[in-house]
Amino acid sequence: MALNYISAAEAASLIKHGYNIGLSGFTPAGTAKAVTAELAKIAEAEHAKGNPFQIGIFTGASTGDSCDGILSRAKAIRYRAPYTTNSDFRKAVNNGEIAYNDIHLSQMAQEVRYGFMGKVNIAIIEACEVTPDGKIYLSAAGGIAPTVCRLADQIIVELNAAHSKNAMGLHDVYEPLDPPYRREIPIYKPSDRIGQPYIQVDPKKIVGIVETNWPDEARSFADADPLTDKIGQNVADFLAADMKRGIIPSTFLPLQSGVGNIANAVLGALGRDKTIPAFEMYTEVIQNSVIGLIRDGRVKFGSACSLTVTNDCLQGIYDDMDFFRDKLVLRPSEISNSPEVVRRLGVISINTAIEADLYGNVNSTHIGGTKMMNGIGGSGDFTRNAYISIFTCPSVAKEGKISAIVPMVSHHDHTEHDVNIIITEQGVADLRGKSPKERAQAIIENCVHPDYKNILWDYLKLTDGKSQTPQAARAALAMHAELAKSGNMQNVDWAQYK
């Protein structure tokens, strides 16, 4: 079947008000860019005429500004799921302008298949190659592309020359059956391949191919500083000690690491610690730091959903694909984040918290309990199922006016039942095998900033102690209330709650 090449504007014109569109990508890697940019123009033109124009968006995770950002500014998004990092989208969500469904990334594809979110009208898929018989070779991310391609009535392909055809073969495309026919996902080590390197679709569904040359809108992160370096070193020291004790096998276990400066500092510290052997990663996102560790021989293999790297780094991977081909694989997000596989492989998860409380509950999504930051992402997929689950964060923020450790988190994402270890620059709180009272003691002694230790000890004195989990109901969120009132949690006055 002959391929039909159209412009981005022509492709965008196929999308109507009220449609749900499914996008490839996971982070800004591998997501639609050209068609969504044109779609924003259509929305603005329709709004100028007094006509409604909004759509629903289903993605693997966040996208770039040419999708989430430009469509938010055009007020073109009615509904979106899941995770995002765009500031304009965040503002619209917190203003109540967009219905945002913040679900676990591993569940996104299956919930779309189950019909929980409605019909997929059109899929927009970024590819490095597409063939007349319907083989779509994805670019730098897996996401939910296999599912939305299968369910969508029509498919638009953004054939992006910014992604080398050397990316062909990087992906392992596998979509599980739905209940009651689902079988085990047969991954027994991070390097296992169980699918095919492309998405096979009915070529009649491909209504247009848009040729682009649009690099991924990758973010770069600030260099490590003494604080993030200390957190990273604390993580590395803890894992090395656990290995020495025999809790972690001497061959080590696969790692999952989140995104950002702290994650990079953790990986850097692990790479430098030669008591930890070269290790594998079974994670959702591969950043520049992982690529450096692969080149240095410190990471033996990386399995992920996306290459969320700078464009120079990505081009280096494409140029050196002979080296990387047996060291990297990209999977759909329901496989990269599969709780089943995470538990089978014994993955050690390392994620970042916004705040944690005295008993090990973690908030990783909301500021002050009500304002969305980014979303839960894949942290829940890994945390509950990890061999060891670790959360990291600085002990304080805003020049010490905010403590990351509070009596009770203002929003619960990860419960005390799932969190094993909390690490700040102050130290490591090992919560494994401990009662709530023992966890509180470990967290205050090891993770809390000195400015807040006495404050939190004094909070515990408000409780009568005759409980499994000591909380003073009236005072549990007093530090948050004080922050809203005076701008500084240190000003909390427990005498008001006696």
Enumerate the language-model features and the residues they cover.
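Conserved alpha/beta enzyme-core scaffold
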Residues: 1-498
